[in-house]
């Protein structure tokens, strides 16, 4: 008797699909009922696998930080100023716009024009309901030009002012 209860309990958890049942076959033809088999996420994944992965990741990060602490860079020297101070890499394009603008107010206006211009892209492309980028030429063109200009300004920010136009290639 306990063996049959064990088998029933196991079948209730795993739920194997009966492919001889015409109702199940009809559901599968309609792409319905495909989640009626397999191991349930609750409680197996949520109570066991997720905490193990999260705690394991935290353990690896803490272990690496304790065993080999990374240096932050050169120690600070308040009496030596670097020749050129650059921001972090993700701020290079904005820094370069400010650097090449003849007037700082114009540089701030140019930086403010970028998000304002991006706000208008959905309204320009509103007539096109496709999700494929090849069928949305305006949004794709704005994305490609914006990416190229951002890369150009980001690379140019690392060069001296007399070489940034050609990116030091010529």
Swiss-Prot record:
Top-level lineage group: Bacteria
Presence of keyword Methyltransferase: no
InterPro entries found in the cross-reference section: Cyt_b/b6_C (IPR005798), Cyt_b/b6_C_sf (IPR036150), Cyt_b6/f_cplx_suIV (IPR005870), Cytochrome_b_C_euk/bac (IPR048260)
Cellular localization per UniProt: Cellular thylakoid membrane
Cited Gene3D superfamilies: plastocyanin oxidoreductase (1.10.287.980), Single helix bin (1.20.5.510)
Any one GO cellular component localisation term in the record: plasma membrane-derived thylakoid membrane
GO molecular function, one term: electron transporter, transferring electrons within the cyclic electron transport pathway of photosynthesis activity
Membrane topology of the entry: Multi-pass membrane protein
UniProt keyword annotations, A-Z: Electron transport, Membrane, Photosynthesis, Thylakoid, Transmembrane, Transmembrane helix, Transport
Bilayer-crossing regions: 46-66, 105-125, 141-161
A Pfam match: Cytochrom_B_C
GO annotation terms (biological process): photosynthetic electron transport chain
Assembly with partners or alone: The 4 large subunits of the cytochrome b6-f complex are cytochrome b6, subunit IV (17 kDa polypeptide, PetD), cytochrome f and the Rieske protein, while the 4 small subunits are PetG, PetL, PetM and PetN. The complex functions as a dimer.
HAMAP family registered for this protein in UniProt: Cytb6_f_subIV
Biological role: Component of the cytochrome b6-f complex, which mediates electron transfer between photosystem II (PSII) and photosystem I (PSI), cyclic electron flow around PSI, and state transitions.
Similarity comment: Belongs to the cytochrome b family. PetD subfamily.
Name this protein carries in UniProt: Cytochrome b6-f complex subunit 4
Species of the source: Synechococcus sp. (strain JA-3-3Ab)
Lineage of the organism: Bacteria, Bacillati, Cyanobacteriota, Cyanophyceae, Synechococcales
Gene name tied to this protein: petD
């Amino acid at each position: 008797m306990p063996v049959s209860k064990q088998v029933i309990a196991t079948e209730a958890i795993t739920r194997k699909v009966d492919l001889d049942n015409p109702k199940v076959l009809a559901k599968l033809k309609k792409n319905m009922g495909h989640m009626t088999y397999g191991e349930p996420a609750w409680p197996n994944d949520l109570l066991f696998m997720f905490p193990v992965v999260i705690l394991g990741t935290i353990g690896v990060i803490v272990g690496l930080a304790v065993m080999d602490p990374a240096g932050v860079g050169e120690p600070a020297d308040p009496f030596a100023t670097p020749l050129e101070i650059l921001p972090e890499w993700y701020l290079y394009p904005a820094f370069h716009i400010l650097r090449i603008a003849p007037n700082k107010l114009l540089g701030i206006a140019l930086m403010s024009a970028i998000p304002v211009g991006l706000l208008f892209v959905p309204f320009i492309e509103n007539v096109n309901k496709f999700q494929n980028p090849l069928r949305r030429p305006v949004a794709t063109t704005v994305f490609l030009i914006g990416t190229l200009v951002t890369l150009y300004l980001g690379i140019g920010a690392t060069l001296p002012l007399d070489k940034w136009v050609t990116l030091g290639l010529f």
